[in-house]
Amino acid sequence: MAQNRKKMWLMLLVISFGGSIIYIFPYLQYTFYDSMMAELNFTHTQMGNIMSVYGALNLIAYFMGGIIADRFSSRKLITFSLVVTGITGFWFATFPSYISMMVISVIWSFTTIFTYWPAVIKAVNQLGESDVQGRLFGFREALNSLGALIFSSTAMWIFTKSGENFKNVVIFYSVVYVVIGIFSFIFLPHDKGEEKKEKVNLFAGLGYVLKSPMIWTIGFVIFFGYAVGSIMGRLTPYLTSVFKMGVTTAGIVGIINTYGVGNVGAVAGGLITDKMKSSTRFLRWCFAIMAVLLVIFVAVPGIPSLLMVAIIMGLSIRLVQTAVRGVYFVPLDEAKIPAKYMGTAAGVVSVIGFAPDAFLFTVYGKIIDSMSEVAGYKVMFGSLIGFCVVGFVLTTILIKMFKKRTAEVGAASAE
């Protein structure tokens, strides 16, 4: 038994470290925005378009990826995803044309979402019985952030030691992708039985899910929580453009912003949620706290002497948002969704919740290009206050919905 547990945690470590690297390329501009834009010679709008193409395709990939995961070995899918993403990284390292970068973004959507995301969820689920699922998924989130922090810190060290050579960073990440892909093939089990899967209606439960107001509300709670996190990923270029922070310092702050606070936020969010016995109530508090912090953050004048204040406020917002990210799928359990429809429900709320990637970056990129950078960034971060207010209202509505749903389930059980 102890040996099986050790093997389980080793496999979780491999899966988690794969998860910590898989999204670094698509979101690399979160950390190296200025360097990436300079090497590619892109405008803010073009940088936003790269993200928007990736995000738009992801909406389809999240929804349809489960079909692939049910028909192929998770080990093969995870290995394929990591290795192919790494290979395209070497292409990215040549700093190709705008059209080529759009093509690369399309490939990344396929390899990081369509063939990867459902396979990872399935692989983690198969590592243990129901009594360890919470720990498996909780530690996966924390190990993801830890691995990303390790890899990103190493990348920043390479960036600094090589005279801020961004190409070396891309090559380093490309190698890591391929290596972890190989480790995944070696250490992860081949899930047998795909060949004997029963034929099922792929759209079973879709009607039930789409007609549920709770599902739509949960989806939009995730939407606004995720949108805050996505835009806070622009903290680094905001600090360099408005507060004149140095490139190396910006890279360090970017790594902490993107990965460092994730360890603390996600774990704390899970623990507090369990203590409160309601993820929805916890999320409501988080939206309220983020709204207050954002008001202060936007009000900080853009002068270099207040750089540290801006950094502290920005990272504080990110900390709360990562706590939100760690638990914003938990309301699906509180909604008492029938187990046979849970996969469909998760797919639908993912499409709604991650929709900001499809358009926010392009919208805000155009806003910043059309205004002064200071004004553009203020508008961008200021809009998040409204997002948090809407999130607060939606979670309040959800709490009432859940009370009604719990009463209905209790009444049905009593009959």
Predicted features and spans:
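Cytoplasmic helix-loop-helix junction between adjacent transmembrane helices
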Residues: 105-143
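C-terminal transmembrane helical hairpin of 12-TM major facilitator-type secondary transporters
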Residues: 279-328
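Extracytoplasmic gate region of multi-pass secondary transporters
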Residues: 29-31, 213-266, 325, 360-361
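Glycine-rich segments within core transmembrane alpha-helices of 12-TM secondary carriers
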Residues: 134-156, 350-361
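Juxtamembrane intracellular "pre-TM" segments in multi-pass secondary transporters
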Residues: 1-5, 191-218
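Helix-to-loop junctions at the C-terminal end of transmembrane segments
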Residues: 61-73, 265-278, 368-369
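Cytoplasmic membrane-interface "Motif A"-like loop-to-helix N-cap segments
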Residues: 71-82, 274-288
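A late C-terminal transmembrane helix in Major Facilitator Superfamily
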Residues: 334-372
